A protein has these predicted regions:
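Bacterial Sec-dependent N-terminal signal peptides
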Residues: 1-20
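A generic structural signal for short, solvent-exposed coil/turn residues
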Residues: 9, 59-60, 85
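N-terminal module-boundary/linker segments of secreted carbohydrate-active enzymes
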Residues: 18-74
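Short cysteine-rich loop/turn motifs with clustered Cys
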Residues: 64-86, 90, 119
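Domain-level detector of nuclease and nuclease-like folds
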Residues: 83-155
Length: 155
């Protein structure tokens, strides 16, 4: 058994963990190689990006869509256009990098790495404030699921 494990370790330890991209290229040549070989040819429109986010990326197996921050959850019909459904149920799109700070143009506005479903009024309330921990005594609103309160919640 020891010989088998030792042999297996030997084989695994010398397997390449990654492949080299653009071998022999450095600096500007490597940069140009990466653009030529990996740059996307198209960018989703903002509407299409939200459709993909709502109906593919963040849609649960039970057709539920859970928002960040509050876990507010809605159920949508995947055979229908998701945006009218999400709008009607107070779910919209959070930009983790705010549009007001440079993410308003293309392709930034529709970059799926920075888009998340969220409860609409929570997103509006948050605005473009920086992420941080706020002392309860300095907080004036608490959100959870579809609930809102102006007083400190009980633990």
């Amino acid at each position: 058994m020891y010989k088998i494990l030792l042999s297996l370790w030997y084989v695994i330890s010398f397997m390449p963990a990654q492949s080299i991209i653009g071998p022999g290229n450095t600096k500007l040549n490597l940069f140009n190689y990466l653009i030529e070989n990996y740059k996307t040819n198209s960018t989703l429109s903002y509407n299409d990006a939200r459709d993909v986010m709502y109906s593919i990326i963040d849609l649960g197996q039970d057709n539920t869509l859970k928002g960040i921050y509050t876990n507010y959850t809605i159920t949508i019909d995947p055979s229908q256009d998701p945006r009218p459904q999400t709008n009607a149920l107070n779910m919209n799109c959070e930009h983790s990098w705010p549009q007001s700070m440079g993410a308003s143009g293309s392709p930034q506005k529709s970059d799926l790495h920075h888009l998340y479903p969220t409860r609409g009024n929570v997103n509006s309330s948050r605005g473009n404030k920086p992420f941080s921990e706020i002392d309860d005594n300095q907080t004036d609103r608490w959100w959870r699921l579809d609930y809102y309160s102006n007083s400190i919640p009980n633990q």
